């Protein structure tokens, strides 16, 4: 017996491709249309998720082709995006910034462990759940890091969050996501881009500055380093 799907809402998206909230027998998920070019790497991402847990990353339930179009069904996380929070309520508290950034470090470290980079870590692509956890969503421009490739074949990413190497001069790697994470931390703390204002907290300011160095060589090597620095800033009595 075929189960019935109900489309509950068309969701806002940065692309013109289909994104909708679906209910099926009491189960809710998000269906997104992806391109033929995105399909192989997102399929690989899905297979990695089946093999090992991925903290702070939206779960992909299925990746498939139907009538010449490609789709993913992914977890629906109840909450609001960082972008929505900044628009409606302004910057986050320092403790919130640190906790959410630590969540994202764990998620990005998972990507990087599997030789993948997200390449679009922005306020619109981070959801704060009702349980107050941060999740990376929309792995639409995921990329596998390829050995011996000197530059990216396509210029992708959100202006302001895209690291210089994403503009085709050198190959992007884990430090590309680190650059975007630094910009995101700054946005959460101040509501502004780093060139406009930096966090008041000296240690947070130092983290943002190192993450967003123009030269990838001067940034943190990995997200674990950032996680440890953030943990040192977090008050001891914070759960």
Describe these PLM feature segments.
Residues 82-92:
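AlphaC helix of the protein kinase catalytic domain
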Residues 151-165:
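Conserved activation segment of eukaryotic-like protein kinases, specifically the C-terminal portion
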Residues 100-101:
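Activation segment signature within eukaryotic-like protein kinase domains
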Residues 67-81:
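Conserved short submotifs of the Hanks-type protein kinase catalytic core
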Residues 112-128:
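Catalytic-loop of the protein kinase fold
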Residues 7-43, 47:
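ATP-binding glycine-rich loop module of kinase domains
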Residues 53-62:
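Conserved HxN/HPN-centered segment at the entrance to the catalytic loop
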